[in-house]
């Protein structure tokens, strides 16, 4: 497999796309609270991406071969939903855990990020799981360097999760 090294200009465009994705999460953060629906959060993000950023919400209508198009602009995974939850009219309530996953396209480059939100007070177990996941993410990121293998990243993440009695989702 040949790995093509991007040019400095391409890397700059990647950074811009990533910054825009992060800005969507910063924009939506004050709106994430009990009483709002994930559908409303999606609508706010959609409008912000299109009208303020002039970015394209990558998930909207994305369909890999054999699948139905994704109907929303962001993914909202509530509580036990692992990933790629579809925003809907369910009202968020105190104690919910919500992950918002944002992917934007700007000048042909994708920026993809997510953030975990706690709605009000969540259980100690939910806080512990989120903390272990956060730590595992950084341990994986720390493995990224010239000559590293993808398996090194996965191993660091999996070893940390398993040391706390958790496992890593293999298929979703």
Listing of model-derived features with the role each one plays in the protein:
Residues 1-172:
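Active-site neighborhoods and metal-handling regions in enzymes and metal-associated proteins
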